[in-house]
């Protein structure tokens, strides 16, 4: 399967949003503010070199959004089109994002995965991401349009 990788630009937004909506797991992780065109534009402005898409025949088939605060990085979204999975695309995107983050001096990265997403949890374990059992993840929405989750 031939595909190319490039850095994400805001011009990719519509295709990325369509990709996210192609899977239930990605769709349920979206929120109307942070994942809006404006939210992603803001994110890319802060993280222009750590977000990548995989493109085949002019169509975006994979995306990873990673960013950092100067200390730690987080994978905010990783998605590969269902028809293009198990071909090494996700691993390739993760590897490129990790390399880009290392170039920016970041030494540690984490990601959030729904507990019931077995395939994703297995994937991240295979990528060397250990499950932290000694922490509780807590969040608070500062905008009534963003759900806090379960």
Predicted feature locations:
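A conserved beta-turn-beta hairpin within the catalytic core of GNAT-like acetyltransferases
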Residues: 67-76, 85, 132-135
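Conserved GNAT acetyl-CoA-binding A-motif
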Residues: 101-113
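A short helix-loop-beta-strand connector motif used in the catalytic cores of GNAT acetyltransferases and
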Residues: 41-53, 74
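Conserved acetyl-CoA-binding loop-helix of GNAT-fold acetyltransferases
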Residues: 80, 86-99, 126
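Conserved beta-strand in the GNAT
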Residues: 53, 59-67, 74-79
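Conserved beta-strand-loop-alpha-helix junction that forms the acyl-donor binding cleft
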Residues: 111-120, 139
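Conserved N-terminal entry element of GNAT/NAT acetyltransferase domains
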Residues: 1-11, 144-150
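Conserved GNAT-fold acetyl-CoA-binding loop/helix
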Residues: 10-42
